[in-house]
């Protein structure tokens, strides 16, 4: 090889890459074209999924002299086809912030732990000794219900699986929940209530087949920009394709919209029922499909808003005790139910032009038009989020536009493994792997058999969900708490009155594992430095059911260790005698005296794969420390839950050779569309369509009404507050705000406001203001000219900025079914800063 990468060679390599991609041939990383001249030849390139959102883009990661020095879009990745968004282009910088945590930090006073002490560096042994002492104290004094963990949709699959074993099988506590409770819980519950199985039936290939795209509360242009390019390509390349965008304000996705619709907050429920009514009234119901593949139910109403039980709103709610209850009805009853949602009534309630409403309804009603519905936080962060999700399924089921190329109700995901880890692994307070639940005795028994632990170990009662965890910390009922891969003191709702006070409650011991000193970390008693992204071997599952695995490419900074290493290493400090009931141990004496490390990891199926099976070209810190191929063992044991049950995963080693596969993977073949014959191996010849998650093979169409938000503007608090993200930053900004280019692009949050509203208050562009709610206040600055154009009476404030904690202001109302927080609707007032 010559010492220089010449222009001709670069062009030849580029042409080869394009040809190979077109032919579906995977080139080795070294053969992929990269810029950089001679230095590029000294860089080792390996594949990985992007660290940020749930799209699951593939990237090539360049390592030189033990550091990640560059990344570029992976041309062999089907998801993004070589593209990255602005965040993805700067992935190489997220691990190298100047304030990276490199050693455990414990609050101390006079050389010993003290809740009111200052952080001091300690060894891992001292950190775990104090941590174990506090955990054992709480277990002894109050039992398993006082121990909890808050995890993440950014956990790798291995980390989430190790955590669910430690909490449920080790400490016998279901107080395990992910921050995905804040983003995907409503979607997951709606999938289960409608189809009996979680996650989308379609895939990203639908983008190239659909004739219409309808965005419900999703600003894809900024939040899922790579997928947005596929919509834009389809819309601009074919004259018949239409795009409808529904939102409470005008944003960048509206720029491509043929049907732009700004509705009053919460009234999307009205629009959904109107569309169902329109389909029925105009005679466009797919009667054969509905007759053979669906059933109808009516949901209970007046279900409350997930506030504290003593809140007057909850006390007055008629059915807050059982919000999931339904009763069977027939099509005629459903028809009568939605008939009141006329065009005129819908236009009046929502504020949307009647013409736009009718155009939207026609997209769904036209039997010749394939429709892809897409949604994310606008639907999910909603006090009736489960209903909203189910109501869009109503529309697709009434028309039969589902489970085939281009006809796809598609729930987009916010985090890189909210699907793969939070949902598929089952790190929610009520779930087990592969859609199993702790409340089902057969599911618990099955899990105990796979885990090779005695029956009766896994508790049957669901644990505290995310918002409830904050309340229980505040009330002193949850006293040992471990937080990994999230920043909930910044990200959670009503943080001033619930979250922060719970962390600083003297009765509680709080541990936070993180890579940077976030607000959450600085609110803790013990901070554990965490390895990031390619500093460990990992696996994510994206929004289209694609599981993607990567190797460890570099070593972690300082003494930082992965969350997986922390979980498994910590388990060594507990014996079964300290955490399991005596009666279970008496009946199973072989478990006595063993550590949780031995029972859950080393001596289980997890520990059976030797180090020799690790690719010799890559390091694996955790496996080297424990003496066996930890990640492979965890994955294969976890995969046993789903194989043969419609959640089939390929053998672990296969994932290292591809850019992910979409489950179910049967006989080495991934599944693009579920529930339809010819695509899904679980649908037998002659069955056509079968929603096999439900025993009768039928999907559910539900009749539920519009109900108002938990809090609406009044004379004093006269403005709606909506929170969310911006293109340049991700979540709380703990990574992206440390990338100089991203920081400069959007250095601080702004209050996006209607210009007339600002003028009426005497506020100019850039004026400093106070945003005040019944719960708290922050300061921000007015933005009337930016990318978001607000209607009168609505403001938008992104939550990435730690200097503007907008969640001090938000309301901790949740969907009573999913327990997911509504960050999109609360009442505030705007005051100038004198």
Curated annotation (Swiss-Prot):
<dbReference type="InterPro" id="IPR006657">
    <property type="entry name" value="MoPterin_dinucl-bd_dom"/>
</dbReference>
<feature type="binding site">
    <location>
        <begin position="266"/>
        <end position="268"/>
    </location>
    <ligand>
        <name>Mo-bis(molybdopterin guanine dinucleotide)</name>
    </ligand>
</feature>
<feature type="binding site">
    <location>
        <position position="57"/>
    </location>
    <ligand>
        <name>[4Fe-4S] cluster</name>
    </ligand>
</feature>
<feature type="binding site">
    <location>
        <begin position="513"/>
        <end position="514"/>
    </location>
    <ligand>
        <name>Mo-bis(molybdopterin guanine dinucleotide)</name>
    </ligand>
</feature>
<comment type="similarity">
    <text>Belongs to the prokaryotic molybdopterin-containing oxidoreductase family. NasA/NapA/NarB subfamily.</text>
</comment>
<comment type="function">
    <text>Catalytic subunit of the periplasmic nitrate reductase complex NapAB. Receives electrons from NapB and catalyzes the reduction of nitrate to nitrite.</text>
</comment>
<dbReference type="GO" id="GO:0045333">
    <property type="term" value="P:cellular respiration"/>
</dbReference>
<feature type="binding site">
    <location>
        <position position="381"/>
    </location>
    <ligand>
        <name>Mo-bis(molybdopterin guanine dinucleotide)</name>
    </ligand>
</feature>
<keyword id="KW-0479">Metal-binding</keyword>
<feature type="binding site">
    <location>
        <position position="87"/>
    </location>
    <ligand>
        <name>Mo-bis(molybdopterin guanine dinucleotide)</name>
    </ligand>
</feature>
<feature type="binding site">
    <location>
        <position position="563"/>
    </location>
    <ligand>
        <name>Mo-bis(molybdopterin guanine dinucleotide)</name>
    </ligand>
</feature>
<comment type="subunit">
    <text>Component of the periplasmic nitrate reductase NapAB complex composed of NapA and NapB.</text>
</comment>
<feature type="binding site">
    <location>
        <position position="377"/>
    </location>
    <ligand>
        <name>Mo-bis(molybdopterin guanine dinucleotide)</name>
    </ligand>
</feature>
<dbReference type="GO" id="GO:0051539">
    <property type="term" value="F:4 iron, 4 sulfur cluster binding"/>
</dbReference>
<feature type="binding site">
    <location>
        <begin position="216"/>
        <end position="223"/>
    </location>
    <ligand>
        <name>Mo-bis(molybdopterin guanine dinucleotide)</name>
    </ligand>
</feature>
<dbReference type="GO" id="GO:0043546">
    <property type="term" value="F:molybdopterin cofactor binding"/>
</dbReference>
<keyword id="KW-0004">4Fe-4S</keyword>
<dbReference type="InterPro" id="IPR019546">
    <property type="entry name" value="TAT_signal_bac_arc"/>
</dbReference>
<feature type="binding site">
    <location>
        <position position="824"/>
    </location>
    <ligand>
        <name>Mo-bis(molybdopterin guanine dinucleotide)</name>
    </ligand>
</feature>
<feature type="binding site">
    <location>
        <position position="179"/>
    </location>
    <ligand>
        <name>Mo-bis(molybdopterin guanine dinucleotide)</name>
    </ligand>
</feature>
<feature type="binding site">
    <location>
        <position position="154"/>
    </location>
    <ligand>
        <name>Mo-bis(molybdopterin guanine dinucleotide)</name>
    </ligand>
</feature>
<keyword id="KW-0574">Periplasm</keyword>
<keyword id="KW-0411">Iron-sulfur</keyword>
<feature type="binding site">
    <location>
        <position position="807"/>
    </location>
    <ligand>
        <name>Mo-bis(molybdopterin guanine dinucleotide)</name>
    </ligand>
</feature>
<dbReference type="GO" id="GO:0042597">
    <property type="term" value="C:periplasmic space"/>
</dbReference>
<feature type="binding site">
    <location>
        <position position="536"/>
    </location>
    <ligand>
        <name>Mo-bis(molybdopterin guanine dinucleotide)</name>
    </ligand>
</feature>
<dbReference type="InterPro" id="IPR006311">
    <property type="entry name" value="TAT_signal"/>
</dbReference>
<feature type="binding site">
    <location>
        <begin position="723"/>
        <end position="732"/>
    </location>
    <ligand>
        <name>Mo-bis(molybdopterin guanine dinucleotide)</name>
    </ligand>
</feature>
<dbReference type="GO" id="GO:0006777">
    <property type="term" value="P:Mo-molybdopterin cofactor biosynthetic process"/>
</dbReference>
<keyword id="KW-0500">Molybdenum</keyword>
<protein>
    <recommendedName>
        <fullName>Periplasmic nitrate reductase</fullName>
        <ecNumber>1.9.6.1</ecNumber>
    </recommendedName>
</protein>
<dbReference type="GO" id="GO:0009055">
    <property type="term" value="F:electron transfer activity"/>
</dbReference>
<feature type="binding site">
    <location>
        <position position="50"/>
    </location>
    <ligand>
        <name>[4Fe-4S] cluster</name>
    </ligand>
</feature>
<feature type="domain" description="4Fe-4S Mo/W bis-MGD-type">
    <location>
        <begin position="43"/>
        <end position="99"/>
    </location>
</feature>
<feature type="binding site">
    <location>
        <position position="85"/>
    </location>
    <ligand>
        <name>[4Fe-4S] cluster</name>
    </ligand>
</feature>
<feature type="signal peptide" description="Tat-type signal">
    <location>
        <begin position="1"/>
        <end position="31"/>
    </location>
</feature>
<dbReference type="GO" id="GO:0016020">
    <property type="term" value="C:membrane"/>
</dbReference>
<feature type="binding site">
    <location>
        <position position="183"/>
    </location>
    <ligand>
        <name>Mo-bis(molybdopterin guanine dinucleotide)</name>
    </ligand>
</feature>
<dbReference type="InterPro" id="IPR006963">
    <property type="entry name" value="Mopterin_OxRdtase_4Fe-4S_dom"/>
</dbReference>
<keyword id="KW-0249">Electron transport</keyword>
<dbReference type="InterPro" id="IPR027467">
    <property type="entry name" value="MopterinOxRdtase_cofactor_BS"/>
</dbReference>
<dbReference type="Pfam" id="PF01568">
    <property type="entry name" value="Molydop_binding"/>
</dbReference>
């Amino acid at each position: 090889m010559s010492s220089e990468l010449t222009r001709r060679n670069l062009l030849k390599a580029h042409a080869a890459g394009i040809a190979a991609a077109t032919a579906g041939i995977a080139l080795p990383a070294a053969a992929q074209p990269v810029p950089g001249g001679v230095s590029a030849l000294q860089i080792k390139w390996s594949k990985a999924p992007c660290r940020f959102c749930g799209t699951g883009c593939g990237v090539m990661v360049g390592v030189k002299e033990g550091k990640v020095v560059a990344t570029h879009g992976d041309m062999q990745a089907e998801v993004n086809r070589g593209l990255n968004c602005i965040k993805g282009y700067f992935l190489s910088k997220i691990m190298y912030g100047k304030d990276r945590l490199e050693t455990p930090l414990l609050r101390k006073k006079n050389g010993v732990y003290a809740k009111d002490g200052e952080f001091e560096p300690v060894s891992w042994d001292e950190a775990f000794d104090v941590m174990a002492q506090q955990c054992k104290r709480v277990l002894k004094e109050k039992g398993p219900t006082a121990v909890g963990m808050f995890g993440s949709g950014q956990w790798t699959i291995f980390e989430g699986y190790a955590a669910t074993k430690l909490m449920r099988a080790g400490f016998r506590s279901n107080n395990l929940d992910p921050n995905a409770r804040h983003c995907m819980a409503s979607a997951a519950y709606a999938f289960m209530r409608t189809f009996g199985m979680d996650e989308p039936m379609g895939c990203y290939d639908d983008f190239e087949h659909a004739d219409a795209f309808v965005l419900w509360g999703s600003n894809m242009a900024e939040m899922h920009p790579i997928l947005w390019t596929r919509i834009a390509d389809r819309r601009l390349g074919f004259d018949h394709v239409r795009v409808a965008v529904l939102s409470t304000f005008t944003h960048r996705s509206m720029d491509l919209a043929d049907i732009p619709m700004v509705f009053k907050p919460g009234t999307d429920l009205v629009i959904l029922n109107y569309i169902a009514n329109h389909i029925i009234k105009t005679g466009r119901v797919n009667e054969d499909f509905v007759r053979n593949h669906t059933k109808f139910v009516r949901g209970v109403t007046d279900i409350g808003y997930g506030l504290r039980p003593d809140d007057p709103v909850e006390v007055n709610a008629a059915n807050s005790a059982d919000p999931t209850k339904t009763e069977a009805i027939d099509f005629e009853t459903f028809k009568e139910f939605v008939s009141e949602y006329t065009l005129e009534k819908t236009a009046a309630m929502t504020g949307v032009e009647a013409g736009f409403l009718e155009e939207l309804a026609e997209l769904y009603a036209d039997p010749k038009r394939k429709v892809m519905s897409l949604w994310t936080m606008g639907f999910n962060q909603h006090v009736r989020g489960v209903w909203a999700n189910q109501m869009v399924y109503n529309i697709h089921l009434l028309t039969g536009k589902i489970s085939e190329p281009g006809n796809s109700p598609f729930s987009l995901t916010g985090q890189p493994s909210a699907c793969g880890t939070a949902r598929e692994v089952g790190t929610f307070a009520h779930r087990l792997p592969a859609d199993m639940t702790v409340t089902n005795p057969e599911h618990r028994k099955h899990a105990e058999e796979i885990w090779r632990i005695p029956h009766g170990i896994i508790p049957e009662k669901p644990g505290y969900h995310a918002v409830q965890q904050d309340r229980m910390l505040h009330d002193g009922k949850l006293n040992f708490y471990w937080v990994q891969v999230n920043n909930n003191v910044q990200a959670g709702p009503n943080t001033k009155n619930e979250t922060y006070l719970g962390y600083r409650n003297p009765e509680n011991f709080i541990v936070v594992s993180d890579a940077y000193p976030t607000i959450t970390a600085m609110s803790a008693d013990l901070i554990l430095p965490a390895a990031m992204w390619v500093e460990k071997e990992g696996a994510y599952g994206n929004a289209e059911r694609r599981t993607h695995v990567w190797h460890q490419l570099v070593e972690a900074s300082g003494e930082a260790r992965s969350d997986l290493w922390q979980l498994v290493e910590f388990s060594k400090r507990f014996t079964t005698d300290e955490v399991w009931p005596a009666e279970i141990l008496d009946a199973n004496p072989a478990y006595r005296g063993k550590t949780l490390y031995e029972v859950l990891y080393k001596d289980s199926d997890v520990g059976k794969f030797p180090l020799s099976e690790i690719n010799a070209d890559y390091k694996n810190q955790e496996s080297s420390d424990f003496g066996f191929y930890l990640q492979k063992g965890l994955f294969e044991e976890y995969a046993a839950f789903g194989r043969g049950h419609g959640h089939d995963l390929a053998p672990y080693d296969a994932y290292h050779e591809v850019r992910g596969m979409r489950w179910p993977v049967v006989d080495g073949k991934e599944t693009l569309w579920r529930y339809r014959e010819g695509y899904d191996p679980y649908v037998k010849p002659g069955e056509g369509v079968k929603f096999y998650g439900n025993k009768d093979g039928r999907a559910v169409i539900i009749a539920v009404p519009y109900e108002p938000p938990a809090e609406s503007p009044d004379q004093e608090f006269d403005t709606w507050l909506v929170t969310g993200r911006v293109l340049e930053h991700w979540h709380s900004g703990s990574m992206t705000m440390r990338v100089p280019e991203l920081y400069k692009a959007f250095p601080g949050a702004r209050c996006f406001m209607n210009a007339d509203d600002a003028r009426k208050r005497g506020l100019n562009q850039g004026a400093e203001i106070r945003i005040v709610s019944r719960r708290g206040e922050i300061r921000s600055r007015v933005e009337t000219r930016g990318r978001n154009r607000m209607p009168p009476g609505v403001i938008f404030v992104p939550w990435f900025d730690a200097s503007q904690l907008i969640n001090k202001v938000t309301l901790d109302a949740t969907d009573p079914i999913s327990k997911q927080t509504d960050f999109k609707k609360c009442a505030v007032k705007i005051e100038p800063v004198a």
